[in-house]
A protein has these predicted regions:
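A Zn2+-metalloprotease active-site environment signal
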Residues: 4-8, 12, 20-172
Length: 172
């Protein structure tokens, strides 16, 4: 029977501890998920991504579209689980992109390409609320945590395989 390498055992134990300590219950749904990213780190990443998006994309100068998105967004934010977030709403002038998103901390973007599909305030509110719910439920942090665990698992496998090759070479 082969003995596991100390590195692999240590990393596996660390992953187990992180997995158990990183369990997070989504307040809205009660669903438990793995979350190894702090809310502060998540907000910082969100702020940076929002700033990058605003510097790279064309921001709409349409006062009607901007007022509509801000008005609807503020109503959703007020009844969300995080009305205290520093909510910001931006319309990007991109008629080819029917999309919207919300980053941690309440940074919301709507692309002008969504307006032909979300003609009424109710339709636009549905899309915006859906995107906002992803941020409130911390889905981005959950995905990052899963990627961290996968990367650590891959490191364990790579180290174990490398050590087995070294041991095999010693025998030969």
């Amino acid at each position: 029977m082969k003995m596991y390498q100390p590195f692999a055992l240590t990393l596996t134990a660390l992953l187990l501890i992180l997995s158990l300590s990183g369990c997070y219950t989504v307040p809205i749904t009660g669903r438990t998920s793995l979350n190894l990213v702090s809310e502060g780190d998540e907000f910082q990443l969100g702020m940076q991504a929002y700033s990058d998006a605003k510097s790279q994309a064309k921001i709409s100068s349409d006062p009607v579209a901007n007022e509509r998105v801000t008005r609807i967004g503020k109503k959703i934010a007020q009844v969300s689980h995080h009305p205290e977030w520093d909510w910001e709403f931006t319309v990007f002038d991109d008629p080819e992109t029917p999309n919207a998103w919300c980053l941690p901390g309440g940074k919301v973007a709507v692309y002008s390409g969504l307006f032909p599909y979300a003609k009424t305030d109710g339709e636009l509110a549905t899309v915006m609320a859906h995107e906002i719910s992803h941020a409130i439920a911390r889905h981005g942090a959950e995905r990052m945590s899963q990627q961290m665990v996968q990367a650590a698992g891959a490191a364990v496998v790579a180290e174990t395989v490398a050590n087995e090759h070294i041991e095999t070479a010693k025998v030969v």
